[in-house]
Design a protein with these regions (language model features):
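A general structural-boundary detector
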Residues: 14, 43, 67, 140, ...
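P-loop/Walker-type NTP enzyme "switch/lid" segment
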Residues: 1-41, 47, 82, 174-175
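A generic structural signal for ordered alpha-helices
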Residues: 12, 34-35, 58, 62, ...
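C-terminal lobe/tail of nucleotide-utilizing enzymes
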Residues: 107-206
């Protein structure tokens, strides 16, 4: 079954207020159109802070933030003291997530917001000092800015190979894929299953 794609472009109207109203309506209409016919909706937003991205965030039930295993990428979440790994201040993105949570609560007139999860991406196969330091920093950060850590993905060639064919590791049992499973593939598929289980979608990976 192929997913339904619905691209949403930012409004080109000159008036900021009118453009924002148009963008908000475009996202709302897309969600309303897709929801009755689909079990899940994935909203992929750019890495920049703009109004359309904020609206997309506000419709989240689960917000997934992938993070390369690097202190350079950790700046996306917060500024960190290099000695203690304690947060010195939240990043613009973390502040945006907090603001969007409030926006969602106001729109839905409830205290319900969304589950913000951070997954480490392209981690090394062998444990390193950097990995341990990242783990410590993220553990301290999670309680400060309100996310939880979920299992991430290791650096694996199979992810890049399957991308070129438009496949995921969950497609490998499908007839016609012609890919022989090995232990590395099985380990990678388990990583996907662990992530899905962590966000409550484990039934879909059986």
């Amino acid at each position: 079954v192929m997913p339904t794609h619905r691209p949403i472009e930012p409004s080109s109207v000159a008036s900021i207020d009118v453009a924002r109203a148009h963008d908000a309506h475009s996202v709302e209409k897309a969600v309303q159109d897709l929801a009755p016919r689909h079990d899940y909706i994935v909203i992929d937003t750019p890495g920049t802070d703009n109004f359309l991205s904020r609206v997309g965030h506000s419709y989240s039930d689960t917000l997934i933030t992938p993070l390369n295993d690097s202190f350079i990428d950790l700046d996306v979440l917060a500024m960190i003291d290099p000695e203690t790994y304690a947060m010195t201040r939240p990043s613009k993105y973390a502040e945006m997530v907090f603001q969007v949570k409030m926006q969602k609560a106001r729109r839905e007139k409830s205290n319900r917001t969304f589950d913000w999860v951070v997954m480490r991406n392209r981690t090394g196969q062998l444990e390193s000092r950097n990995q341990r330091s990242m783990e410590e920093a993220l553990t301290k950060l999670s309680s400060r800015i309100g996310f939880r850590q979920v299992p991430g993905f290791s650096e694996r060639v199979i992810f890049r190979e399957l991308f070129l064919d438009g496949l995921t590791l969950l497609d490998l049992k499908t007839p016609g894929t012609d890919i022989r499973m090995n232990m590395s593939h099985l380990s990678a598929r388990q990583e996907v299953r662990d992530l899905m289980a962590a966000i409550g979608l484990d039934r879909e990976t059986q």
